Amino acid sequence: MSYPWPLDASELFGERYPQMINTGLPVGDVDTVRAAVSDMWADAPGGWVHEWSKLAAAYADAGAHDRAALAYGWAKFPTLADASKRVALARQLEQYQLAAPDFGLRFRRQVLELPYRGGTTDVPVHLLAPFDLPAGRPVLIASGGVDSWKMDVHGLLVLLATQLRLQVLAFDIAGTGESTVPMTGAGGAELVGGLIAHARSLGNGVVGHVGISMGGYFSARSGLAGDVDAAVVLGGPVEAAFTGARKDVFGMDGIVGNALGFDAPPTDEELALRRAEFSLRPLLDEDRNAPMLIVNGADDVHVPQHDTLVFQGRRDTVVDLVPGTGHCAVSKLPEVFPTILGWLDRTLNTAVEAAR
């Protein structure tokens, strides 16, 4: 259920550099790896996995387990297309757990057995909460996207837990990270439904959903369906991104193809057919949504502006298309995230009051 494909490492660095340096790695170290990498798939000097893993191992040897986890996260990026990427993910998890005592939060890892297509599947989750978590607080479920997973967005999860003083349940969407099932719209949504039900049992019953990138597809889906009490969609595709009219860039065809479960590069027709079932048009045509906050950068090369602006005019929905930034507004997150935190705080508190 994986395959490598032609991918220019220098182009990936060009696109993801802001994300690399804004999530906790020193600029100089990122620049050193960037200068050393000449091939995406070679597990040898000059190869993406090799050079990022070399940096990660140096951090680990120095006891900087948080940075080691981040660097191994980039080593396995953008998908688990071969054995060396899978090794990097295992090492990322190891370093992440070693870093946990210094998170400044209560951390717990669990593997949930959730309903899936007539059977069950295991879903590893990470629970983060303040040490002095008040009783009777809401719970947030949160995920990254198709190539940046729960451990890769740790910094944002910490902000959510500490600033909102609640428990965050972090997971990988279907087809990514530690998930063992392919990404589909219905199947992935079924797993999210199981996570929502579990989250309602952990706090006061009020649950919010924060989704980043492709994770935003699933938070849009749960928000539009009214399955949660608040939904944040950060850079999520919902409709136009799934049409054949757009061209994939920066290797996104292979990233998505791997997540969908192909074991060899699909044809354009095969990829388009799988993508078509993700459209949220049926839910967009209904009026039963929970309160929603939709945010993205106006210059996103992966998700058309339509997929943000289509939410304008909806009941209980705030839309923010941020100028001068791209996918998930990543270069302006220090400006955008306080808005997200403020909206969540108000919306979840309103839901708590309404439930009393």
Predicted segments, located by residue:
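The serine-hydrolase catalytic nucleophile loop
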Residues: 146-158, 306
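Conserved alpha/beta-hydrolase
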Residues: 161-178
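Conserved alpha/beta-hydrolase "acid-adjacent" motif
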Residues: 301-307
